[in-house]
């Protein structure tokens, strides 16, 4: 019984192959990722060739590509893309302010004045900067007295106290 079934399957396969013989082709086979189109030319098959790992060639564009952090808008101009440029590591440019920034340990209050911030100034290890003085510093061996004048200081300049 098995022999009869096996002979029947073989006879069926032979009959099918005889009914649809392969045409004899004069053209050589196409390369990998190519197929023969209706005109007989080898054409690239981007969809069936290698799946996602195969890169499809980009279409040729008349416009050159935009620089990093820029994209081409609908009118064809390169426009800066602040949000899509490098993620969180990329700093967005700060808005231009008319007021200059406050010094260290100071902050700008609601009226626009720089106010000293004792609590937010780095703790005990942070030295508070000295206030800016209009008077220039005194020369070596001199110090500024209570009236703001530079006075010679003999003891602060290597003299021996009695």
Curated annotation (Swiss-Prot):
Annotated CDD domains: Ugr_9a-1-like (cd21873)
Entry keyword annotation includes Signal: yes
Domain of life: Eukaryota
Example GO molecular function: toxin activity
Signal peptide as annotated in the record: 1-19
SS bonds (residue pairs): 30-42, 33-49, 66-78, 69-85, 102-114, 105-121, 138-150, 141-157
Propeptide regions on this chain: 20-23, 56-59, 92-95, 128-131
One term under GO cellular component: nematocyst
Keyword terms of this UniProt record: Cleavage on pair of basic residues, Disulfide bond, Ion channel impairing toxin, Nematocyst, Neurotoxin, Proton-gated sodium channel impairing toxin, Secreted, Signal, Toxin
Location relative to the cell: Secreted; Nematocyst
Notes concerning its domains: Pi-AnmTX Ugr 9a-1, AnmTX Ugr 9a-2 and AnmTX Ugr 9a-3 have a structural fold called the boundless beta-hairpin since its beta-hairpin is not stabilized by disulfide bonds.
Family classification: Belongs to the sea anemone BBH family.
Protein name: Precursor protein UG
Taxonomic source organism: Urticina grebelnyi
Organism taxonomic ancestry: Eukaryota, Metazoa, Cnidaria, Anthozoa, Hexacorallia
């Amino acid at each position: 019984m098995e022999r009869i079934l096996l002979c029947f399957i073989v006879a069926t396969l032979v009959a099918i192959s005889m009914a649809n013989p392969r045409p004899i082709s004069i053209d050589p086979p196409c390369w990998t990722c190519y197929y023969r189109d209706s005109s007989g030319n080898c054409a690239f098959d981007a969809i069936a060739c290698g799946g996602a790992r195969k890169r499809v060639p980009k279409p040729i564009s008349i416009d050159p590509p935009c620089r990093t952090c820029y994209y081409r808008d609908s009118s064809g101009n390169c426009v800066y893309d602040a949000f899509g440029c490098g993620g969180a590591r990329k700093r967005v440019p700060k808005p231009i302010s008319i007021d200059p920034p406050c010094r260290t340990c100071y902050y700008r209050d609601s009226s626009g004045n720089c106010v000293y911030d004792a609590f937010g100034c780095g703790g005990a290890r942070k030295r508070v900067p000295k206030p800016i003085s209009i008077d220039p510093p005194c020369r070596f061996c001199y110090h500024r007295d209570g009236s703001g004048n530079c006075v010679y200081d003999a003891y602060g300049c290597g003299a021996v106290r009695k």
